[in-house]
Amino acid sequence: MAARAAVQAAAAATKGKKIIRHKMKEDVKMAELSPMMKQYLRIKSENEDSILFFRVGDFYEMFFDDAKKASDELDLTLTGKDCGMEERAPMCGIPYHSCESYIARLVEKGYKVAICEQVEDPKTAKKLVDRDIIRVITPGTVIEDAMLDEGKNNYLAAIALTEDGVGLCFTDASTGECHLTSFPADNYNSAVSDELLRFAPREILAADSLKAKSAALWEFLQENFKAAVTLRPNDAFDPKKTEELFVKHFGISELEDRGIDKTSSKAAALGAVIGYLYETGRTGSISVNKIDVYTDKQFMRLDMTALRNLELTETMRTKSKRGSLLWVLDRTKTAMGKRLIRSWLEKPLLNITEINLRQNAIEELCDDTIMRAEITEQLSGVRDIERIMTKVVYKTASARDLLAISATAHSFPAIKNLLAGAKCRMLREICGGIDPVEEIVTLIDDAINPEAPVSVREGDIIKGGYNEEVDFIRGDMSSGNSFLTDIENREKERTGIKTLKVRFNKVFGYYIEVTNSFLDKVPADYIRKQTLTNCERFITEELKEIERRVLSAKDRIEQLEFEIFDGIREKVAAELKRFQATASALATLDTLCSLAGVAVNNRYCRPLVNNSGNIIIKSGRHPVVEQVIKTPFVANDTTLNMKDDRCAIITGPNMAGKSTYMRQTAIIVLMAQIGCFVPADSAEIGLCDAIFTRVGASDDLAAGQSTFMVEMSEVAEILKNATKHSLLILDEIGRGTSTFDGMSIARAVLEYVADKKTLGAKALFSTHYHELTAMENELQGVKNYNVAVKKRGDDITFLRRIVPGGADGSYGIEVAKLSGIPETVIRRAKQMLKKTEEEGVVTYRTVENPDMQLPLEMQGAQDILHDLQTIDVNTLTPIEAMQTLFEMVTKAKSI
């Protein structure tokens, strides 16, 4: 209410004065400005790319262009403020104590917010209060809880282009974790895009020269990301400066100590991130310590299409967690565990040893139900110490944050005891990684008041008995307050006013309140201060003296308590690495317990993961679908290998379950490679280096692409990037164009995928082109499967079983009937089908002799024939082959 009244008063004050409506640089005359406005413009000139929150009393105020932007984005009243000129400066403001929600809204929209605080006490300032920027908040540097999703990392990325290639750095400023990789200069666009999509950063740092160096990469960043792209000076990516920053931050002289060549693109990207965090943080310290240097060979490749189609972390339709694989697997108890299990899902492993380590830990937790239950109970009380410790380092942590650290650390010994008898290596390593930090727990418990307020500047945060000076001042204040009680009793007796009260407020300080019925008894030494409806308020010289003494003591103790607290906070910050190591261990334990619990509850099995190249699944189930349907899920087998069963052609009607089955197989492979148990009776999974999917139909109207063009673009990317160790999920290739075009493309793609001379990858290939089933007898490694259907008269029942052989019909009319198409339409469709069948249909005929002369007697046929004869299939890339096919089809249609 007070804040609203202040804004209304400011708005009323603007009447009669014109508000400046133009850009400040063009219209403001510095010589005419007030001292505070000169100070504002000086600070603003150093932060032109940010909205400046300028602290004035209990408000953050914005002026000029910033005021206009903020009023529009935050729905604030745009008013004006005297600035020394004839016109008033545009102004809007928000209460400082509720600033986080406003900052969050601006940051969400991609703005940077510079926080300018009063860095000296206004009470002691002789002239203008000194102000300075204490922090710049950007989408990628947020550390405030209110602006973060506890279950997601908030990554800041940097892209460094150097002569040796491109370096990528992904850092979560709120947790301190940092991931670093690089790619060679000859082919990095697709790899960079995959990593950016995997980490989904909120902000991307790039050099000013990026657009000139790589127009394709710049265009990709602009078109495919909601992330804010922040351009930085080219020298921010200078590896020489990176080394200086490393020395400053890590206390080492050589980047090589962490396995990073100091002239590499990785070093340049890391340096850009660290420099930016120091620049925006303004505290002289940051929480980045955990640097993970990785290569793309460590993790399964998952491109944007696969991440979307497999619905790993969110559904395609609603973009929500519910209905995704993460929704099924995430039973974690800590925020740190929630972030880690998401990371595991997005980065399946390619190292069998690491996979087995996770499997062994999950198996032990599955078998020891009591241990798992007790660990889970302990983890339920663990707070997000990763992010709390970052606040400690940035000096924004409150006393309550330190109490949360202590409360969490009290559970560490119990968790270590539960793991003390663990058999598997991973659980033993977790046990060793949990540091009880007893001395920090003792310090916090001894020093911090359990009932401490949120603010660290208002006192009452240091526990009694911890500091003698604090106790002494509190005693002095207490005696002052007891003296006030004595005054009240004495004045009641002296004046005979039984209702007399001695009270305090921030406006008048200490005062005596007398009701109207006793005003005739007020003595002459009372000084009238305020008249209210039912009473009047008075002060005396004695009260003012007590007030000066008490308030002076209050100021002293608030400052003293803050200094003591700040010292304790620095001691806690010094143990950052210990807390981060413990947080990492707890997150891993939480994730393993979650996966073990889900495995037990959902009857998952431990898969055999090896290098055989086989995918053999017995009674596999879709982990998400089986949780949401009301009827029992129909399990299916899958057999793929590198010899006779590389490619499975799957036919059958729509709605029968082909897409579910194909996604289910891909998800089981992915689950196995994160070390998770899988929904099947048994499974052997040969490592897959990538999963590629082409599922469903969608237009990209914004890019001017039809459903068919989107489909072909995705297929081209798959054929370009897949290897023989990849798993391909290809659903209805070619359905977006005419029947014969589509069938030709589908066959060409399947031949390319199945043939070992071109690719030879494992694939599930669903199609409505039943003519393609002939390929089982023509191409080694291709097998036919179909979705079993039971037909009675005109009715069909989907059995959801995948069985060998091609489908005996498309059942399109029957499916249309099930979907509710009017009976008259169904009857007409049957008539048309019968007529077509009676008149004969054109079937696909395999060309057995590639050298035979085709009967092309129409005009222009010789040109097409010549083109065919001159094509060198061995030198064409997949995308060139696709383009050539399009051109020939177009030419044929024009004849």
Predicted regions and their residues:
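Charged, surface-exposed helical/loop "interaction arms" that form contiguous linear patches used
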Residues: 394, 398, 408-411, 464-465, ...
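Terminal-proximal interaction/regulatory segments of ATP-powered molecular machines
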Residues: 505, 869-895
